[in-house]
């Protein structure tokens, strides 16, 4: 099978390869696709990155059903002008299609990764190159396994190459759900072993930007450890195990900070600025291009229909995404992070006040992603920022507080984040209110608020609330919210196909 387009319909590492080459399409790993050379392996690994993007809308993009909206759509920082009430109001079922797309897209992606890894093992190429590319695929596979776990709980994954490479075995493979112990150990082991052979971000060639790095593997270890700490405390009632995981958070964040690979940007909004792409705060980026299926479409989802660019950029505006005023109003008026949420905008004639003059659903416009001159229709070239260094800093502060209480180091880490949010921070009341906290519970409660202000509309809110045991009590106060809603339902179509697979409790 041949193609004259090495993008594989979704490849974002365009600069790495010539679009004039004719290569095998390794995003379809059938028996006819044989890899024999280093270039074959490189193309095949690049092809597996397609699974991050899907069709350009869901998965690690921003449309409904993406990881982003799955992680905020049932929380207090999110609202929408469109009819997505099943998620917004905790009314989802196993038949809610949008909330099952991540599952039905990424579980097969894990199988593809397993197939590719086995084929790569059998190829005779340079050992360091082989280890590096296999590490990339293992990191991707572990990342997908973690995000599926966070959303749906443990799910059956094909990690056995004998099954993955045999269509008949794969078709008849109907396992029960794996244990939490097996699943967590699988993710942790894959990430640790991948990390050993991944490049630091600073050593990537410009054409390699967007590939898996040592920092991304560490970031997902951090996410896994924080997830397990929260689960053990609030849902498994094992404080001893929770503390074990907090110690792992302590260790991995210490390593990441001492490595010096990443640093905070001085200006908060510059993190997402089109003129500051590939900056040192971004750990996990997805590069974009102003083309269908390859671009960033966040602004199209967020901008009101009558919004007019003051930069003369032709923008698509669907007016969906919102930040409820109740959440917006938790920001201090002098907190510069609030500037990422538009309360007023230009409609070509005047500034519109969304509180008093907007007739749609009430709320501010999330606009961390900014107007980009490189825009075609709804697609622009701003990279997606999936994870960034500020998460590491606040995660370390949280771990230190859980282990030792609100130490000075923990407070100093919070100061690092707040110093760029407030002018003249040193000696201000904003610095003092952190220094005055002496109680572990009070510091924990503040960290949850701080993360809300720092990461609004970045996909952190749902896991943060769950880790603190507060999703159901805080998130929107919806009447239909129940304890079962800390997980989404496995799609009913998957349950029909595998009679041994039991859905999450309550679905």
Each model region followed by its residue ranges:
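Short, surface-exposed recognition loops and adjoining beta-strand edges that mediate ligand/DNA contacts
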Residues: 32, 59-77, 158-161, 199-216, ...
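Flexible, polar/acidic helix-loop-strand segments at domain edges
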Residues: 88, 326-389
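Membrane-proximal, proline-rich intrinsically disordered regions
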Residues: 19-66, 92, 243-246, 253, ...
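Long, intrinsically disordered, low-complexity segments
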Residues: 18-21, 96, 106-109, 180-182, ...
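Conserved, well-structured interaction surfaces
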Residues: 38, 42, 46, 50-51, ...
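Bacterial Sec-dependent N-terminal signal peptides
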Residues: 1-27
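Short coil/turn linking the two alpha-helices of tandem helical-hairpin repeats
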Residues: 149-150, 156, 227-236, 402-405
């Amino acid at each position: 099978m041949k193609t004259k387009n090495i993008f594989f319909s979704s490849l974002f590492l365009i600069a790495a390869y010539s679009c004039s080459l004719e290569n095998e399409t390794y995003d379809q790993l059938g028996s006819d696709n044989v890899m024999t050379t280093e270039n074959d392996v490189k193309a095949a690994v690049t092809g597996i990155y397609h699974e991050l993007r899907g069709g350009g809308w869901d998965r690690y993009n921003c449309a409904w059903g993406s990881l982003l909206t799955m992680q905020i759509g049932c929380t207090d920082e999110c609202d929408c002008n469109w009819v997505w009430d099943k998620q917004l109001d905790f009314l989802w079922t196993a038949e809610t299609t949008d909330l099952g797309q991540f599952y039905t897209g990424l579980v097969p992606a894990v199988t593809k990764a397993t197939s590719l890894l086995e084929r790569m093992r059998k190829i005779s190429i340079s050992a360091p190159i082989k280890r590096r590319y296999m590490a990339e695929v293992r990191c991707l596979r572990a990342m997908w396994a973690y995000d599926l776990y966070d959303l749906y709980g443990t799910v059956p994954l094909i990690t056995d190459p004998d099954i993955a490479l045999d269509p008949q075995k794969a078709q008849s493979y109907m396992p029960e759900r794996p244990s939490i112990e097996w699943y967590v150990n699988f993710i942790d082991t894959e990430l640790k072993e991948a990390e050993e052979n991944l490049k630091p971000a600073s050593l990537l060639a410009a054409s390699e930007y967007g590939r898996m790095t040592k920092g991304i593997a560490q970031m997902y270890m951090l996410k896994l450890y924080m997830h397990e700490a929260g689960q053990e405390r609030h849902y498994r009632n094992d404080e001893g195990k929770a503390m074990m995981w907090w110690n792992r958070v302590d260790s991995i964040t210490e390593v990441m900070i001492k490595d010096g690979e990443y640093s905070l940007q001085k200006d908060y909004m510059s993190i997402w600025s089109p003129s500051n792409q590939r900056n040192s705060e971004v750990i996990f980026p997805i590069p974009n291009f102003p083309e269908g299926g390859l671009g960033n479409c966040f602004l199209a989802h967020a901008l009101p229909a009558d919004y007019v660019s003051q930069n003369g950029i032709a923008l698509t505006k669907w007016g969906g995404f919102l930040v409820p005023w109740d959440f917006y109003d938790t920001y201090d008026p002098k907190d510069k992070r609030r500037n990422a949420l538009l309360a007023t905008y230009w409609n070509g004639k005047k500034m519109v006040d969304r509180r008093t003059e907007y007739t749609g659903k009430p709320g501010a416009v999330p606009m961390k992603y900014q107007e980009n001159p490189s825009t075609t229709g709804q697609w622009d070239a701003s990279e997606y920022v999936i994870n960034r260094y500020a998460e590491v800093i606040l995660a370390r502060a949280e771990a230190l507080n859980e282990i030792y209480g609100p130490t000075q180091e923990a407070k100093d880490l919070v100061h690092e984040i707040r110093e760029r949010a407030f002018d003249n921070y040193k000696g201000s009341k904003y610095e003092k209110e952190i220094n005055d906290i002496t109680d572990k519970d009070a510091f924990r409660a503040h960290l949850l608020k701080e993360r809300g202000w720092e990461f609004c509309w970045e996909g952190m809110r749902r896991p943060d609330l769950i880790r603190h045991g507060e999703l159901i009590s805080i998130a929107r106060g919806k009447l239909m919210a129940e304890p079962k809603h800390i997980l989404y339902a496995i799609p009913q179509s998957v349950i029909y196909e595998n009679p041994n697979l039991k859905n999450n409790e309550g679905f």
